[in-house]
């Protein structure tokens, strides 16, 4: 998943700041216009090998070398709406794909494995801040597939004594996020003079985390994380969807009258919240102020319309279709 959202932000830092420290092999399916553009624009240098492959077929890939010290898995199907009406691809990529990666690591004596999970595996909350030891209670097929992957990782660790660490970030935002997600979808709609669509009444709360803070957290786990441990990554910043929409609209001198409320997503979780003291104990802390990071993100989408404009029309069509199919699936 090296050319996806978090994976690409991680890869950029790895290549730009640590290019002489590692030999890196990246795998990505390149199954959308955004990952293809990411692939085209990054000068990776001599220490990087890229393979356009599916992790489900990891054992069929011909690597130039396979004596890896570390595998980090960013690859995932991640759109909740899609998972409601088409869960199969989520099980294939997020569960079977992870199983195949772990088998590859086991068979090739890979020393360490890091699974990038999500805070959504804990399920919804009102006042509780989930800790890494809390029981998983996923609500959507997407989060269930990620929770299943976490359990597969746990089983491989216990059965085969593998060095596995799991990272569960909060809701990420920032440059290179596909515009089907709330913040970039809203920004792109505003730029193109469309209404900002919000599910339900907009009261759903998310724990917002700038992607560059996430990347730093991953590097900290690589550096200091302990085998078998799970690490939440959070920021302590919480906003509901109405607040996010209003903040973005205000940057363009627009009022909340530009918000369009649409029928809520089936099984929409009210709030995600995680305690990230364990990662903080390793010496990590979020560095980016939310307002400044949101401004930086907005500027990036303004300056990089060529990156997202090709796919946004289809995303809007798919969004309408997904909402309709998801509701019908839920009714059945």
Language-model segment annotations:
Residues 1-172, 296, 304-307, 313, ...:
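N-terminal Rossmann-like NAD(P)+-binding domain of SDR-like oxidoreductases, especially those catalyzing
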Residues 5, 78, 177, 239-240, ...:
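Short alpha-helical
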Residues 9-13, 30, 53-54, 190-332:
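C-terminal substrate-binding subdomain of Rossmann-fold SDR/epimerase-dehydratase oxidoreductases
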Residues 36-37, 84, 179-180, 208, ...:
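Conserved strand-to-helix beginnings and helix N-cap segments that scaffold or border functional pockets
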Residues 59, 81, 88, 99, ...:
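Residues in well-ordered alpha-helical elements
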Residues 128, 179-187, 263:
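A glycine/serine/threonine-rich, flexible loop-to-helix segment
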Residues 138-145, 169, 175, 179-183, ...:
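The catalytic Tyr-centered alpha-helix of NAD(P)H-dependent dehydrogenases
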Residues 148, 152, 156, 186, ...:
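Hydrophobic alpha-helix immediately C-terminal to the catalytic Tyr-X-X-X-Lys motif of short-chain
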């Amino acid at each position: 998943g090296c050319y996806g959202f978090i994976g690409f932000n991680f890869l950029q830092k790895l290549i730009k700041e640590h290019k002489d420290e590692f030999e890196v092999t990246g795998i990505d399916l390149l199954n959308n216009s955004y990952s293809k553009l990411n692939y085209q624009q990054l000068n990776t240098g001599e220490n990087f090998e890229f393979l356009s492959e599916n992790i489900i077929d990891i054992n069929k890939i011909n690597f130039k070398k396979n004596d890896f010290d570390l595998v980090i898995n960013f690859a995932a199907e991640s759109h909740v709406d899609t998972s409601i009406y088409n869960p199969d691809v989520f099980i294939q990529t997020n569960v079977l794909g992870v199983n195949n990666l772990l088998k590859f690591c086991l068979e090739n004596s890979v020393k360490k494995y890091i699974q990038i999970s999500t805070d959504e595996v804990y399920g919804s909350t009102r006042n509780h801040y989930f800790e890494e030891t809390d029981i998983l209670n996923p609500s959507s097929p997407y989060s269930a597939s990620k929770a299943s992957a976490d359990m597969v990782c746990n089983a491989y660790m216990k059965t085969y004594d593998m060095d596995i660490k799991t990272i569960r970030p909060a809701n990420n935002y920032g440059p290179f996020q596909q515009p089907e997600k709330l913040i970039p979808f809203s920004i792109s709609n505003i730029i193109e003079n469309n209404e900002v669509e919000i599910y339900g009444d907009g009261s759903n709360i998310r724990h917002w985390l700038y992607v560059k803070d996430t990347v730093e957290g991953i590097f900290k786990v690589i550096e200091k994380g302990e085998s078998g441990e799970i690490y939440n990554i959070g920021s302590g910043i919480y906003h509901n969807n109405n607040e996010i929409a209003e903040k973005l609209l205000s940057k363009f001198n627009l009022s909340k009258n530009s918000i369009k409320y649409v029928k809520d997503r089936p099984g929409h979780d009210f709030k995600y919240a995680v305690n990230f003291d364990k990662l903080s104990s390793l010496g990590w802390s979020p560095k980016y102020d939310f307002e400044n990071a949101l401004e930086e993100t907005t500027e990036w989408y303004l300056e990089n319309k060529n990156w997202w404009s090709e796919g946004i029309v289809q995303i809007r069509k798919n969004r309408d279709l997904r909402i309709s199919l998801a509701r019908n699936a839920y009714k059945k």
